[in-house]
Amino acid sequence: RDCESDSHKFHGACFSDTNCANVCQTEGFTAGKCVGVQRHCHCTKDC
């Protein structure tokens, strides 16, 4: 089962999945990607 959350540390529009994933890892998540029309960074991890 995956837990999902918007990144709390990522600011601004998200255009790089790699950058998003790196920020998510500093928040304790295992992955992250840019999603949505507004391109926000969305983090995921196993829970």
From Swiss-Prot:
This is Defensin Tk-AMP-D1.1. SUPFAM superfamilies: Scorpion toxin-like. GO terms for biological process: defense response to fungus; killing of cells of another organism. It comes from the Eukaryota. SMART domains: Knot1 (SM00505). It comes from Triticum kiharae. Plant defense peptide. Belongs to the DEFL family. Disulfide bonds join 3-47, 14-34, 20-41, 24-43. The lineage of its organism: Eukaryota, Viridiplantae, Streptophyta, Embryophyta, Tracheophyta. Signal peptide: none annotated. The keyword Disulfide bond applies. Keywords: Antimicrobial, Disulfide bond, Fungicide, Plant defense. The keyword Cell inner membrane does not apply. CDD domains: Knot1. InterPro entries: Defensin_plant (IPR008176), Scorpion_toxin-like (IPR003614), Scorpion_toxin-like_sf (IPR036574).
